[in-house]
Amino acid sequence: MNLYATILAGGSGTRFWPVSRVQVPKQFLVLQGTQSLLQATVQRITPLIPPERIYVVTAAHLQEQTVAQLPEVPAANILSEPVGRNTAAAVGLAAWHLMRVDPEALMVVLPADHAIADSAAFCASLQRPLWRLNMPICS
């Protein structure tokens, strides 16, 4: 099992207006501490998934800003949506890309704009179902 993370970071920021805007959507805001919500999402998942297996799907106009925010994630792993078509299309783009990179990939999809206080509990909640994937279906 090859576990990858896909972080959805293509939001336009209109629902959190006036704090977030089209050029500075919610995922780039620092709501607590010193990290943006996007940076905190990457840090939160890194104990389970190394940066080279983290992919971020973002809007084309946010590509450079996303790369700049995440120096630990390879720039090639920042996928740009040609046109924003919401969640299903972004997940589909990442799945299509990962299928080409690693046919054995298992993808965890995460939003970039959630504030989660207990990172250890979050990672533990992701690990619980993963062990079942290594169990045989029939014995």
Regions found by a protein language model. Name each.
Residues 1-7, 15-18, 22, 27-111, ...:
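Conserved N-terminal catalytic core of the sugar/cofactor nucleotidyltransferase
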Residues 134-139:
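A short, conserved acidic/glycine-rich loop-to-beta-strand motif
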